[in-house]
C-alpha cells in the first residue's frame, strides 16, 4: 500500500482559530485520523499528514476548508463541531469515489446562515438542486436525513431573495403515525402546526426568527395543512409538499393541479414511512408510477449514502432497506408457492 506524507501550513497563524479547528483535546483531529485512517502530527499551525495518498489529500483539503470556516464573524471565532467534521469527511469520500466532482450548486444557492453557506454534500443532492432549478415540479424521494426538505427550503428562500417568486408556501398532509387529529386539542391549524415544525426550523435557520415572523405576517411565507390548498391556484409561488407519502391519490392530484404560472413545486417523501390506513395507496407511490414520463417533472431518489446526519443513521437506513428487501422476497416466494399448490390441486 502506498503511503504518502504531506505537510501543510494554515495561515494566518491564530491560536484561537487552531483550537477551534482541532476541537477540545484534539477531538476533531482524532476523528479525521480515525475515519480516514491517517496520522496527523501538529506543531502550531503546521500539520504533517501520513497515510494513503487519496486520504491525505482529502484530509489536507478538509483542514484548509474548515480553517477558513473558523474565521471570526462579528468578532467571534466560529467553533468547528464534530458534525461538521463528519459532513466534510463524507463530502471528501464522495469526491474520491466519483469520476467527477459534485456540481457546484453552491454558486446558485449561496445562503449564509448561522451554520455557514448551504450547499449540496453528495452528487444526488447536487442533481436534486439542479433539477429544482430546471423543472417546474420536482420530487425528492428517500430516507430521513438526506436533505430532501432542507435543500428544497433553501432553494425556495433563494428564489424569494432573488425576487424570482413572490411567496413561499409550505404544506404537508395532516397524518402522523399512531395519532388521530380529531383527538388533539385546538382547531385544524393548531393541530397540524407541530407537524410543520421541521419546515419552520429550516426557515428560522436560514432567515432568522424575526424575519420569518414578519414574512408570515405579510403572507409572503405561508405554512398550512394540505387541506387548505383545495380550490386555490398558486401563481408566482414556490410550493413545498413535505411528507407526501401520507397523501392519498386524490390529495396528490389536488395538490399538483394547484400550481399556477411562474410557480415551482417540490414534493418530498419517504415511501418506507407511510402512515395511511391499510389498503389506502400512497399518492406519492402512485405519482411515481403515473408521472414518470411527464415533461417538466423530475424524480430524484436518495439512498443511505446521501444521509448527512450521524453516521449511525446511514447504517440504520441500510439495515431497514435490507430487511424490507428480504421481506419482499419472502412474500413473493410465499405467493409463488401458493400459486403452485393451487395449480397442483387443479
From Swiss-Prot:
Localization per Swiss-Prot or TrEMBL: Cytoplasm
Keywords recorded for this protein, A-Z: ATP-binding, Cytoplasm, Nucleotide-binding
GO cellular component, one term: cytosol
Pfam families per UniProt: PhoH (PF02562)
InterPro entries with a match to the protein in the record: P-loop_NTPase, PhoH, PhoH2-like
Gene Ontology molecular functions: ATP binding
Chain positions recorded as ATP binding sites: 142-149
Top-rank taxon, per record: Bacteria
PANTHER family: PHOH-LIKE PROTEIN (PTHR30473:SF1), PROTEIN PHOH (PTHR30473)
Family, similarity comment: Belongs to the PhoH family.
Protein name: PhoH-like protein
Species for this entry: Escherichia coli (strain K12)
Gene from which this protein is expressed: ybeZ
